[in-house]
Amino acid sequence: MKTRIHKILADHGIGSRRGIELLIRQGKVLVNGKQASIGQLVNENDIFEVDGRFIKLNKKTPNNKRVLIYNKRVGEISSRKDPEHKKTIFDALPRLKSGRWVSIGRLDINTSGLILFTNDGVFANDLMHPSSSIEREYVARVHGQVTDEILKKLVNGVKLEDGLAKFTDVQSGRKGNTNQWFAMVIMEGRTREVRR
């Protein structure tokens, strides 16, 4: 049975449908040695090459979804490839027999915390999409005094360069002499949103 290339590769954890479409546009996806086209119909018996790597599809269990929780430390890079060729968290993940790990969100190099990974690109995209309404909880240390008025503004919304940002919940935690900890919940995952 023929299936669109985006779906079959996403179902086997190669990436999200949009990510696969971008790779196709960049000419980085081959089917049976020929450049793939967007919307192309394929089947699991075809030979796939993605970004210079041959991909073996698992015909028995295409929806053998795996999810992994990774505790990222400060200083680790959470993108798949680093321009300076430093190791990334993808290098520390267990090898998959087929497909690849897709991160569900990212944390910048100066942030530590849990990141989810899956081999199911559609599942990853569903979780990351704003319509999923999934809460993301962060804990941050803030230097200086944070007033109730500031906390109210954070819940009501603060205008950033890329639009309005707001926390759905902010809870104060442990206080020090010059800083205080806060637990914050947001419903989206924009770049460095909590830090900003």
What are these regions, as identified by a protein language model?
Residues 1-196:
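Basic, flexible Lys/Arg- and Gly-enriched helix-loop patches that mediate nucleic-acid binding at interfaces
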